[in-house]
From Swiss-Prot:
This is Pentatricopeptide repeat-containing protein At4g33170. PPR repeats lie at residues 73-107, 109-139, 144-178, 179-209, 210-244, 279-313, 314-348, 349-379, 380-414, 415-450, 451-477, 481-515, 516-550, 551-581, 582-616, 617-651, 652-682, 683-717, 718-753, 754-788. It comes from Arabidopsis thaliana. Pfam families: DYW_deaminase, E_motif, PPR, PPR_2. It comes from the Eukaryota. Residues 865-895 are annotated as: Type E(+) motif. One of its GO terms (molecular function) is RNA binding. The lineage of its organism: Eukaryota, Viridiplantae, Streptophyta, Embryophyta, Tracheophyta. Keywords: Repeat. InterPro entries: DYW_dom (IPR032867), E_motif (IPR046848), Pentatricopeptide_rpt (IPR002885), PPR_At4g14850-like_plant (IPR046960), TPR-like_helical_dom_sf (IPR011990). The keyword Coiled coil does not apply. GO terms for biological process: RNA modification.
Amino acid sequence: MRSTSKAIPFSFHTSLIVQCLRPLRFTSAASPSSSSSSSSQWFGFLRNAITSSDLMLGKCTHARILTFEENPERFLINNLISMYSKCGSLTYARRVFDKMPDRDLVSWNSILAAYAQSSECVVENIQQAFLLFRILRQDVVYTSRMTLSPMLKLCLHSGYVWASESFHGYACKIGLDGDEFVAGALVNIYLKFGKVKEGKVLFEEMPYRDVVLWNLMLKAYLEMGFKEEAIDLSSAFHSSGLNPNEITLRLLARISGDDSDAGQVKSFANGNDASSVSEIIFRNKGLSEYLHSGQYSALLKCFADMVESDVECDQVTFILMLATAVKVDSLALGQQVHCMALKLGLDLMLTVSNSLINMYCKLRKFGFARTVFDNMSERDLISWNSVIAGIAQNGLEVEAVCLFMQLLRCGLKPDQYTMTSVLKAASSLPEGLSLSKQVHVHAIKINNVSDSFVSTALIDAYSRNRCMKEAEILFERHNFDLVAWNAMMAGYTQSHDGHKTLKLFALMHKQGERSDDFTLATVFKTCGFLFAINQGKQVHAYAIKSGYDLDLWVSSGILDMYVKCGDMSAAQFAFDSIPVPDDVAWTTMISGCIENGEEERAFHVFSQMRLMGVLPDEFTIATLAKASSCLTALEQGRQIHANALKLNCTNDPFVGTSLVDMYAKCGSIDDAYCLFKRIEMMNITAWNAMLVGLAQHGEGKETLQLFKQMKSLGIKPDKVTFIGVLSACSHSGLVSEAYKHMRSMHGDYGIKPEIEHYSCLADALGRAGLVKQAENLIESMSMEASASMYRTLLAACRVQGDTETGKRVATKLLELEPLDSSAYVLLSNMYAAASKWDEMKLARTMMKGHKVKKDPGFSWIEVKNKIHIFVVDDRSNRQTELIYRKVKDMIRDIKQEGYVPETDFTLVDVEEEEKERALYYHSEKLAVAFGLLSTPPSTPIRVIKNLRVCGDCHNAMKYIAKVYNREIVLRDANRFHRFKDGICSCGDYW
């Protein structure tokens, strides 16, 4: 016995166990809140009928249910089956079962239990039960111990040895051969059928053996005349630490040769008389029944009574209580039980230590689990398996692999459970493929690679690491269950070989294997990235037919598939079909709207989400920030930022970066920079967002300064970083700086320049007036120039008046994109600026000949959360007269300040006065006039234009900002322009 004075990790309070009753008072199966059915009046009547075995009361209750319940709940019907079974009416139980519209595993377990409990265990009934079990295997993929228990009982009644062996094999296949109840029943069957050798093997493999099983083995040895084996077993029983009951004492007396006197062996009772042994057995039996029926409040009360009554607990008590702590998710209870075990010295027992490891792992306290494991004086394979599995399942893969290597060094032979756990851990690591292959070699060495669990785990490991050839070799060698099929399909999907996923799915159904939620979710994901909407619709129909469309995981997969395929109508239907969408489903719908260009709808969905009381997560916030960026809706973006602050997720790198990008793209670069400085965990994406934002706003020097700061902090730039840096050089006319960073990109960081980087450099040359150098750069590139590069160069030719180079560039641009309207427009603008009206008309004629229409230019402004759109000479606004009057006032005021209309931007050959008038009512001027009328003085006016701002409007904006003392932020197709005090942030480089 361990000294009670030893320091223990937790303080022990018996009262805490009693306190655990309060939060769990309604968690038992009989409590009102345990299900919707149990709160009804019918459940109480059924319980009374079962308790009193009153068939008449049960029938009357059934009749009332049929009268008053149009669609009785499945839980209630299951209890009807149990009632008829307990009251001895198998016929009525079967009738209720046959009429059930849909059945779950509990329904099947109930009817099988009815056959097993029937006093009429005739051959016909046994055969009917076996037939039901075969049907069950077709309808339900997974079964439980509650399914096997009645089947094993029927095997015992029937005397069918072959059936018992078949169920034993099935138990091994589904991993229940180690279950104490299933294994115990199998031991009992083998012993009753005289197969003592088989019973002994199974008995010795069991992780926990109660006194009843020991009694069965002792009795079998005695009845078969194996007295030496019985003596050895009695010694082993003494070493186990279990307390014998009265039956044990009689059997031990028979071994000693005196059936009438058990005094010679009473020392096995450890100083307790038979009555005290019977008391603890009775108490443990009650605890076990409460545990398996889910009546945790009653169990805790029973245990508290044991403690207060000074009933000495044994290892079985502690194993049951530790299992209870896991069931009710109570670390406090688990620690108190651990404390009691320490005080009584029972934590030294192997089975108790193993249960402690299991409890701490299930409650995610891996440090405690490892401490228990490290302090064990004796460990068996179950100890190793428990700690490896617990650690592997909760993200500590490296530690799990190290423990596996330590196990091998100890000379222990891993079993299928060890191998599956370590394979799961190894395959998740960066070096997962190499480790998985080493484990595979060891599995071959110890000859357990043929085990279905190990083979399936190997398939999963290879699939995770996209080594599908190795997975295929394993898969083709055996007839696998659904788990292996799922692993293969998931592997193909992860390897971007979706066509094989769909082929395997079709083959699986052809061979009669039924899908589960994981299968369907994988297939929908595959259909999404393949844009295979027709196949997706077929699988959707199958999901509806099989009832999986109501599964949240599957329904989210259906929604995501339609979103990725661009069918938002079908996506909306799928979303509306989800009974209670979670945050993932809402976010999928929101991001789908954004991906398909329906940003305003995304905000509408978000409003519905908040009305439903669903809190957005970090991904939702980041997605909505992106929507604000696309709409350049600053006010909505600010609201999203406010939501992020309320949810305390602004420190999330993903959210912070998205908000920085949103403010930058909405024209509020100061807000973007303030938020950027407050991000605590800054990654390269955040730096890139800020660099690109500054570049778009023409803050070239600030961009380069920030880039220098980033490098000083040891953050390595990537290709996106250099796009921002080169863009800043381009917009600020820093040609030499652009060349310098282009060389540094490849020489210092090993980043090969791509088309986007060359585009920025060519743009920098064009804006600086070095049009021919830009043309030479494009011609000298090793890669083919893009249409956007030629488009940028053509715009530069228009600004510089280089019609000769512009003509060559336009020819190459039209070869790449003959239907690009901007090419014709830029060409005609270039000729108009040079007063070459005949060439301009020819360009327009070419445009008409190719039936190309010019993209209409328009500008918009957001006022009071409403978007107002304007086109040239627009008179659709209800305030048109006021707006046009304001434009006239603006032109008058800025002319007095020195503004001179740049009539070169007029594309018609008319009188100068007409040219001026044509410039006055460009869309951006109308939008600014509306902004002056509709926004408070001194507040910034933010205007967005879909095309590049014309030179005259750009010049006019500088004067308007100065005369009216307003900051004007104008975002065109190329960049941001911030007009303040008569100066633009672009420095006239645009």
